Amino acid sequence: MSLKEFIGNKWTKFIFWALLYVAWVIWLGNFWWLFGLIVIFDIYITRKVRWNFWKKRYKEGEKHSAWNEWLDAIIFAVIFVTFINIFFFQAFKIPSSSMERTLYTGDHLFVSKLAYGPRVPQTPLTIPFTHNQIFGKESYSTLIQKDYRRLKGFGHVKRGDCVVFGFPNGDTVLRKAPAEDYHALVRILGRDKVASLGETIVRPVDKKDHYVKRCVALPGDTLEVKEGLVWINGVREEQYPGLQFSYRVVTNGQKINTKTIEKLGINPSELYYDPSLPGYPAMILTSEMLGEVKALPNVIEVSDNFETDPALYCKEIFPFTDNSGWTRDFFGPLWIPQKGVTVKLTEENLPLYERIITAYDNSDLQQALQAGEYTFKQDYYFMMGDNRHNSLDSRYWGFVPEDHIVGRPALIWLSTDAGRRFPNSIRWRRFLKFV
């Protein structure tokens, strides 16, 4: 038997696909799926059932229909890509500048679900190639809802990882403004005012909008932000290359040259020059860029834009209490909840854990209050953007539950700048760049 005959043999094909299928079932951990071997056996060996019922059977010499061939190819592509999206990789586009210098607005990524293990779909009835919306309507049905379960991956979330996750506050959204934080609007405007803004949608965990941030604290860590810098368990965090902050830049009355600004990697259209300062009230800079700006001949002074008055931000900064004394730059210390750990519930720490108990762990708050303690059902993480003064992150909405973790950015396959025209809009230097 030649190699070509061996590869084309029906038993060879059956054994190959059967072994792959069994490996997938073992990974999935649900052995009821082994009954699928009957289907594979029939496809390649017995051929009793016409599984590709949509495909026309042609008589010898009959001309093949191009439409039928295209339909066959499309059905295969939909099944194959959906399988890849669920278990291996998923495309994701960076929507904001919160990770600027590390990940840019307009970066198109492949997110590896194998990094931490893929989640088994909790909302399986979903239109292929959509996440949560199509034409302004839900692209999924909640008729079938599964419990959270994660398959084994290559590892676990580590401190410093860039992580894609479901937005924790995205369980409730306004249909007309799905990108807005509904819970923040309720705190600031009041529930009655928000109710007047239109219909709300309740989304399952796996249908929340995706965010990407850097994991700065793991379950069991104690986090504190002092003068904008993160400290974990008393140790200052690693200074990542893309880390940047907002600075107040005072000049001698002359603007910084546009070419100099562009050379720094800053879009001049995003800078505001205040003649009364004179200078720039908010310039976003990395430590390297900061040194270059300070060295410019027309720059007199550069100072940090720290938020120091907690009274001004109590409705914006987690845990949204008047007496926390926290701002985006002076935050904590805060202990990150860990699965299986029991904490005593007090009047002081209840605002920290109330949403965990009711929304993420789906437990009974009154029962926990009566017991005076609570045991966490899953791990939690603290995420922050590298653009620390232009990032809505865990400082503004709290902890990220483990069941919200989607994966880790793996590859930038395309990057475009919306502020430029094609072909200059394509950032070629970021093409096929590993994250």
What positions do the PLM features span?
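Extended hydrophobic leader/signal-anchor segments used for secretion and membrane insertion
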Residues: 1-435
